[in-house]
């Protein structure tokens, strides 16, 4: 699994003009991609890493502060641009594989006590955020 984690002051996701998920105070936006070989174990490991990642102000984590997390599925994180000018999406898992793993990631965050908002899996979403810092990290879990 791959995640792009951004420290934000606020963020929201809209689908067809309707807000489906938002955080209104400082926290994290996590864009999550899934590849073919990913497992529930990896989803849980990524959730632990994100929840305990000390990138909030004061070198604190969401686990320590209760800061909210907005999770957005994003298959394009596995886009391959090594050949030509049109990305290949072959490394991205199909929806039937990816959606349950995104759900497992979110469920593990919530099980750990995180306040989690989400986008809509597979939807055409508009993600608005105020990146704080900016602080942006790419996490890969094998």
UniProtKB/Swiss-Prot annotation:
EC number(s) per UniProt?
3.1.1.96
Q: Name one GO cellular component term.
A: cytoplasm
Gene3D superfamilies, per database record: D-tyrosyl-tRNA(Tyr) deacylase (3.50.80.10)
Q: Name one GO biological process term.
A: D-amino acid catabolic process
Where is the protein situated, by its record's location annotation?
Cytoplasm
Q: Where is the signal peptide?
A: none
Reaction equations catalysed = glycyl-tRNA(Ala) + H2O = tRNA(Ala) + glycine + H(+); a D-aminoacyl-tRNA + H2O = a tRNA + a D-alpha-amino acid + H(+)
Q: Where is this motif: Gly-cisPro motif, important for rejection of L-amino acids?
A: 133-134
Taxonomically, which superkingdom?
A: Bacteria
InterPro entries to which the protein is assigned, alphabetical: Daa-tRNA_deacyls_DTD, DTD-like_sf
Q: What's noted about domains in the record? A: A Gly-cisPro motif from one monomer fits into the active site of the other monomer to allow specific chiral rejection of L-amino acids.
Assembly description: Homodimer.
Name the family.
Answer: Belongs to the DTD family.
What role is this protein assigned? An aminoacyl-tRNA editing enzyme that deacylates mischarged D-aminoacyl-tRNAs. Also deacylates mischarged glycyl-tRNA(Ala), protecting cells against glycine mischarging by AlaRS. Acts via tRNA-based rather than protein-based catalysis; rejects L-amino acids rather than detecting D-amino acids in the active site. By recycling D-aminoacyl-tRNA to D-amino acids and free tRNA molecules, this enzyme counteracts the toxicity associated with the formation of D-aminoacyl-tRNA entities in vivo and helps enforce protein L-homochirality.
Q: State what protein this is by name.
A: D-aminoacyl-tRNA deacylase
Organism, by scientific name, is Acidothermus cellulolyticus (strain ATCC 43068 / DSM 8971 / 11B)
């Amino acid at each position: 699994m791959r995640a792009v984690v951004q420290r934000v002051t606020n963020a929201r996701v809209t689908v067809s003009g309707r807000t489906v998920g938002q955080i209104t105070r400082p926290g994290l936006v996590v864009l999550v991609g899934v590849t073919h070989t990913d497992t529930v174990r990896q989803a849980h490991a990524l959730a632990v890493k994100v929840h305990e990642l000390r990138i909030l102000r004061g070198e604190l984590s969401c686990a320590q502060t209760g800061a909210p997390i907005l999770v957005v599925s994003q298959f394009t994180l596995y886009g391959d641009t090594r050949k030509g000018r049109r990305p290949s999406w072959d490394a991205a898992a199909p929806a039937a594989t990816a959606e349950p793993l995104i759900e497992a990631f979110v469920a593990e965050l919530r099980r750990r006590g995180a306040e989690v908002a989400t986008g809509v899996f597979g939807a055409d979403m508009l993600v608005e955020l105020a990146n704080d810092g900016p602080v942006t990290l790419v996490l890969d879990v094998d």
